[in-house]
């Protein structure tokens, strides 16, 4: 393998050792030096990463602009910070993790010096934590909206506090990277790598550090999100059975479930799919890393392209979020349509009446946008 595969397989390049798993490499240096190369599998990884970078940057910036300046402002006031933070976390992943990974795979070794080694590894772990924790906040918000629909007055303040906590925790949990990573020159050869070699005196320290970040990055978010949506589904099922029992009585229903507004159900479906995409995209990568952790010899057995494909598949998650948001949000699609039609609008005065009619039509659609129908109840 070449490059640094971020987090779970951080330096699996035969640079200092061949058994580094997660963020560390504390084993003795290998006796026979094998110069890392920019392999065909790594070339595919770099090309795929650059494609994902372009799409993720454009789509997440579009979501952020829509929520802050466009029709996305029609979202309920407490939902806007959630969507904006999710897009921001994806942008941090896009502008930190993807370029770093691509360049590092091309150069194979580290050329940016010790300070940049520490900073980039810190930002990399911060980006991955923030992306996971923001999804936890979104799940907690939907959990509260469905199970406590009348408790809406503090929704915005509660979400802001949770988002602030998520960002601060991400910074704190990533801060050890500033101390354990450094630029190391391999003995006897002209080769420098950014690694954690020698930062841990005992193997159990390495294991504890690895396990801790595996739990905070994957296990804890997965457990919280699973618990939230399990309770939500149980509550929806309970309300559906209650509505069936009252089928003979006159009642007002705004969606397929009793007393749950259609806009709230639409937001719930969107967040479930966003969380599912996170789990689907990143699970293979994390499981492979844990497998290497307990069976490091498999690093020599499994083909290089498997690691590269799994990491690229994990990065695909940053592209999925804006696509899912756009599918469920007419206002975002309207903003994109307005952006693409802007040049045509200025090119021909005859197109103005038609364009204005189109905008009125989209505006009517946006009235049923997710969150807009939620605003009277605050959810």
Swiss-Prot record:
GO CC, any one term: plasma membrane
Record key words, sorted: Cell membrane, Disulfide bond, G-protein coupled receptor, Glycoprotein, Membrane, Phosphoprotein, Receptor, Transducer, Transmembrane, Transmembrane helix
Residue intervals annotated with topology Cytoplasmic: 66-80, 141-167, 231-283, 329-379
Post-translational modification, as annotated: Phosphorylated on the C-terminal cytoplasmic tail.
Residues with glycosylation annotation: 4, 18, 23, 105
Domain of life: Eukaryota
Entry-linked Pfam families: 7tm_1
Gene Ontology molecular function, alphabetical: G protein-coupled receptor activity; peptide binding; protein-hormone receptor activity
Topological category with respect to the lipid bilayer: Multi-pass membrane protein
Disulphide bridges, residue numbers: 117-194
Matching CDD domains: 7tmA_GnRHR_vertebrate
Cell location: Cell membrane
Main subcellular localisation: membrane
Record topological domains on the Extracellular side: 1-45, 101-118, 185-210, 303-308
UniProt family annotation: Belongs to the G-protein coupled receptor 1 family.
Descriptive protein name: Gonadotropin-releasing hormone II receptor
């Amino acid at each position: 393998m070449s490059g640094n595969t971020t987090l779970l397989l951080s330096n699996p390049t035969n640079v200092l050792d061949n058994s580094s798993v997660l963020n560390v490499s504390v084993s003795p240096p290998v006796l026979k030096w094998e110069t890392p190369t920019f392999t065909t599998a790594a070339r595919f990884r770099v090309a795929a990463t650059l494609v994902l970078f372009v799409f993720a940057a454009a789509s997440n910036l579009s979501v952020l602009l829509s929520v802050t300046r466009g029709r996305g402002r029609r979202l309920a006031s407490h939902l806007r910070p959630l969507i904006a933070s999710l897009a921001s976390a994806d942008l941090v992943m896009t502008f930190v993790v993807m370029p770093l990974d691509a360049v590092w795979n091309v150069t194979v070794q580290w050329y940016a010096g010790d300070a940049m080694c520490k900073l980039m590894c810190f930002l990399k772990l911060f980006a991955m934590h923030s992306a996971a924790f923001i999804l936890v906040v979104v799940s907690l918000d939907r959990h509260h909206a469905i199970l406590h629909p009348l408790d809406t007055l503090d929704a915005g303040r509660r979400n802001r506090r949770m988002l602030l906590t998520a960002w601060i925790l991400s910074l704190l949990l990533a801060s050890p990277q500033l101390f354990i990573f450094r630029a190391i020159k391999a003995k006897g050869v002209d080769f420098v790598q950014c690694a954690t070699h020698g930062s841990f005196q005992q193997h159990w320290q390495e294991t504890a550090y690895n396990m801790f970040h595996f739990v905070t990055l994957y296990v804890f978010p997965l457990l919280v999100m699973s618990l939230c949506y399990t309770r939500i589904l149980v509550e929806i099922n309970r309300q559906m059975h209650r509505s069936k029992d009252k089928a003979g009585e006159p009642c007002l229903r705004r969606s397929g479930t009793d007393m749950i507004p259609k806009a709230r159900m639409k937001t719930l479906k969107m967040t479930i799919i966003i969380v599912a995409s996170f789990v689907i995209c990143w699970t293979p990568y994390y499981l492979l890393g844990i497998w290497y952790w307990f069976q490091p010899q498999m690093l020599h057995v499994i083909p290089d392209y498997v690691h590269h494909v799994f990491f690229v598949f994990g990065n695909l998650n940053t592209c999925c979020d804006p696509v899912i948001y756009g599918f469920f949000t007419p206002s975002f699609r309207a903003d994109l349509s307005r952006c693409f039609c802007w040049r045509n609008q200025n090119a021909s005065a005859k197109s103005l009446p038609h364009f204005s009619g189109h905008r009125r039509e989209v505006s009517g659609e946006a009235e049923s946008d997710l969150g807009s129908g939620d605003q009277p109840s605050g959810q």
